[in-house]
Amino acid sequence: MATELDKIFLILEIAEFIIGMLGNVFIGLVNCSEGIKNQKVFSADFILTCLAISTIGQLFVILFDSFLVGLASHLYTTYRLGKPVIMLWHMTNHLTTWLATCLSIFYFFKIAHFPHSLFLWLRWRMNGMIVMLLILSLFLLIFNSLVLEIFIDISLNIIDKSNLTLYLDESKTVYDKLSILKTLLSLTSFIPFSLSLTSLLFLFLSLVRHTRNLKLSSLGSRDSSTEAHRRAMKMVMSFLFLFIVHFFSLQVANWIFFMLWNNKYIKFAMLALNAFPSCHSFILILGNSKLRQTAVRLLWHLRNYTKTPNPLPL
């Protein structure tokens, strides 16, 4: 039977699901309608749409996972149900993270200005480089899936012990295997984080250089390029902040799950963990002029609709 904590946890998870769905469905619908209308799909819109679709899939997996943890946590230890849910969550999370990273890199090459020949060469081949990053992410996904499968097999075989911590103390070999596998899974998460952090640092350097050139030419410090730099930096910084919260929450959740199974604190870690797919879409909407203007028009129409008095029945 669900406790009060379980009910609060499920209510908050459903709220995160609704918030995330609203933002990502909006992004997908706007970009698809624009692509159909213009008969052309731009690279940024394509990445945004793929990111929205991937996040929608992740949100559904998260919702199912939350109901499983909140209402039937004992089923999580079953090999037939626990393994597919964990694998699906990691796959959708991997795709979402890498697509968000590709979007950060795309904005960097689209907005930043450097006279260096290497930067110009990479910028000229930006679309091909994004494709190569996506191919790299697929290879890493295969590697992660193989490592994760071994990790789950070992964990689910021992998680039904009455005292997992004591069992791991007695079996140092198993503990060492779990530690190595967990380290490998964590290291692969640092690759998209480091790429996004590098993009942010170079965006900042480009903004400083651009602002200094404007001051030297007596044109002030605000123009369209400066604003584009700042918007892109805010988007990448917000992504990095959410990613840091997401990454550390994942480590805490894994530790609680495998060392203190069925502990109530895993629910708080899951709430923080799932903030990334729920909130990131609204950061993307605010940072994209087309999406932001469409959202403002939609809210304006909804406001006018709610204020329109209903006609009296005859």
UniProtKB/Swiss-Prot annotation:
Function text: Receptor that may play a role in the perception of bitterness and is gustducin-linked. May play a role in sensing the chemical composition of the gastrointestinal content. The activity of this receptor may stimulate alpha gustducin, mediate PLC-beta-2 activation and lead to the gating of TRPM5.
Transmembrane region(s): 8-28, 51-71, 102-122, 128-148, 188-208, 239-259, 266-286
Membrane as UniProt keyword: yes
Chain positions carrying an annotated carbohydrate: N163
Keyword check for ATP-binding: no
SUPFAM superfamilies, alphabetized: Family A G protein-coupled receptor-like
InterPro entries listed in its UniProt record: TAS2R
Extracellular-side segments: 1-7, 72-101, 149-187, 260-265
Protein name: Taste receptor type 2 member 42
PANTHER family: TASTE RECEPTOR TYPE 2 (PTHR11394), TASTE RECEPTOR TYPE 2 MEMBER 42 (PTHR11394:SF70)
A GO cellular-component term linked to this record: plasma membrane
Subcellular location: Membrane
Record GO terms (molecular function): bitter taste receptor activity; G protein-coupled receptor activity
Domain of life: Eukaryota
Similarity remark: Belongs to the G-protein coupled receptor T2R family.
This protein's UniProt keywords: G-protein coupled receptor, Glycoprotein, Membrane, Receptor, Sensory transduction, Taste, Transducer, Transmembrane, Transmembrane helix
Note: Most taste cells may be activated by a limited number of bitter compounds; individual taste cells can discriminate among bitter stimuli.
Annotated membrane topology: Multi-pass membrane protein
Cytoplasmic side: 29-50, 123-127, 209-238, 287-314
